[in-house]
Amino acid sequence: MASPSRQAPLGGSGLLHGSRARSYGSLVQSACSPVRERRLEHQLAPGDTLAGLALKYGVTMEQIKRANRLYTNDSIFLKKTLHIPILTEPRDLFNGLDSEEEKDGEEAVQPSKDEVRPHSAERKKRERGLGHANGEPLPTAGQEPARHDLSASDFLKKLDSQISLSKKAAAQKLKKGESGIPGEDSSLHLSSPRMQQRAVLGPVPLTQTSRTRTLRDQEDEIFKL
């Protein structure tokens, strides 16, 4: 009996049969998968180049060529628009599952209202106690403390008024000092008998000693030099 003809297995190595990669549709995890790509439409300008567009959108030149079926860099000017493939985040592929998990995590982290209320009540009691101790009236529950939000012009006007007030106060102090200091000095000087004698006799000439003469001679020599 003749042996049955053997059929070559599919995907065998040979000239006519290339090796096939087995995949399972949506389970393929590839960075260049069309499911994870979204394409932006870019209007071409006269100065646009493939390298510039790749840098601008954060993709490679080969990806732009593959998406637009370009074979050379100069063939981009044959089209008015180019499709730029941009990878989407894997979070978009889960149809909102991650967002629900994030919400659950945030609810677990945030404290409940029952836990927050006793802390706020304790703070209010402390603030009331401090206010009564300082003698300052505290605002009621319905009233909020007034906020003084000054504009730039109001702040400058307030600063100018404070400067003018300080200048007036300084001038008044100087006037009081000029009027009060001479009287005080005269009363102090005339209180002692020695000062009274000096006031009557006038300035007393200094006695010239040998020490004073030598000092004056030295000063004269210094000025001559």
Curated annotation (Swiss-Prot):
Record has tRNA processing as a keyword: no
Entries under Pfam families matching the protein: LysM
Compositional bias per record (Basic and acidic residues), positions renumbered to this chain: 112-121, 214-225
Compositionally biased intervals (Acidic residues): 98-107
PROSITE patterns per the UniProt record, alphabetical: LYSM
InterPro entries with a match to the protein in the record: LYSM1-4, LysM_dom, LysM_dom_sf
LysM domain segment(s): 40-84
Disulfide-linked positions: none
Keywords: Phosphoprotein
Region entry Disordered, spans: 97-153, 170-225
Residues the record lists as Phosphoserine modifications: 23, 33, 99, 164, 179, 192, 210
Keyword Phosphoprotein recorded: yes
Protein name: LysM and putative peptidoglycan-binding domain-containing protein 1
Organism: Bos taurus (Bovine)
Lineage: Eukaryota, Metazoa, Chordata, Craniata, Vertebrata
